[in-house]
Curated annotation (Swiss-Prot):
Top-level EC class as recorded in UniProt: transferase
Annotated pathway: Pyrimidine metabolism; dTTP biosynthesis
Gene name per UniProt: thyA
Binding positions for dUMP per the UniProt entry: R23, R178, R179, R218, S219, A220, D221, N229, H259, L260, Y261
The keyword Methyltransferase is annotated on this UniProt entry: yes
The family this protein is said to belong to: Belongs to the thymidylate synthase family. Bacterial-type ThyA subfamily.
Cellular compartment(s): Cytoplasm
InterPro entries: Thymidate_synth/dCMP_Mease, Thymidate_synth/dCMP_Mease_dom, Thymidate_synth/dCMP_Mease_sf, Thymidylate_synthase, Thymidylate_synthase_AS
GO term, biological process aspect, one: dTMP biosynthetic process
Keywords for this protein: Cytoplasm, Methyltransferase, Nucleotide biosynthesis, Transferase
Chief place of localization: cytoplasm
The name this protein goes by in its record: Thymidylate synthase
Amino acid sequence: MLEQPYLDLAKKVLDEGHFKPDRTHTGTYSIFGHQMRFDLSKGFPLLTTKKVPFGLIKSELLWFLHGDTNIRFLLQHRNHIWDEWAFEKWVKSDEYHGPDMTDFGHRSQKDPEFAAVYHEEMAKFDDRVLHDDAFAAKYGDLGLVYGSQWRAWHTSKGDTIDQLGDVIEQIKTHPYSRRLIVSAWNPEDVPTMALPPCHTLYQFYVNDGKLSLQLYQRSADIFLGVPFNIASYALLTHLVAHECGLEVGEFIHTFGDAHLYVNHLDQIKEQLSRTPRPAPTLQLNPDKHDIFDFDMKDIKLLNYDPYPAIKAPVAV
C-alpha cells in the first residue's frame, strides 16, 4: 500500500528510537536520518489508517503559495493550524488586558478550567482577526513563515526573491537543472523566529517527463505532523507538474530528527494495528494552469475511505 513507508517509519521509531528530552518538555523517541519514497503515479499518499483532514492541508498550502503570512485566510477556511503563534504575539502585547495566558499551551492541556478560559480568549482573538482589519494586520501576521520565504525571501539588499516562482520558470526552461531548490532556512532569521522552519529545503527533479520532489525536514512529529507534510508536498508536486505540463514522479521525504512524542505512543500503536486501504486519487482543475491562481474548489480528493481519526495532544 502507498502509505507503507510511513507505517514502517513509525514502527522503526517504536522499536529503535532513542529517548530524548525536548523543547516542549514532553519527551520523544527519535531516530536521525531516514528516507521515505512515494510513487505518486500509484495514488495520492493521504493516510488511510486514520482520517487526515485534507481541507486543512489544501488551505494551508494555498496560503503558502499565495505568499500570505496572515492567519485571516486560514481562519476564513476554518483552519486553526497556526492560531497559537499569532495568539502568543497578541497576549504578550501591551494592548492585551485579558486573563493571564502565560504558557497557555502547556496549561491548557493540564488544567481543564484554564483550558475553557483559553479557548474563549482564542475565539475572541480569531473573531477580531476575521473582522478587524487593523487588528488583523498587527496581530494576525506571522512574518517570516513559509509563504514569505517561498514567495518573497528578504535579501540583505532590501529586495525580495520569489523562489518558487523562479523555480517553476526554471523547470519550464531548464528542466534538467540541479538548482531547482526552494529554501526556508535563513540563519540570520533563526534566532528571532517563533519556530524555525521544520521543512528546511526542497528540490525538484525532472526525468522522462515526470516531476519528482525531495523534501529535507529537520524535525518531524511522526504522529501528528508527518501525515500532513506528506500530503502537502505531494500536493505541491502535483500542482507544479500540472503547471509545467509534466506527469508526477516520486515524493521523497528525507528526515533529520524523526520522533514520536511520549504521549503519542498508544495512538501510533493503534494506528499500526489497522490494515491500510487503497489510496485516494487527486483531481486538479484542468482549466487552470497557474498554480498561484488555484483555490480550494480547484483541488479535489476522490475515493478517500480512511479509518476514524485518532486524537492526540499537540506538543507546544
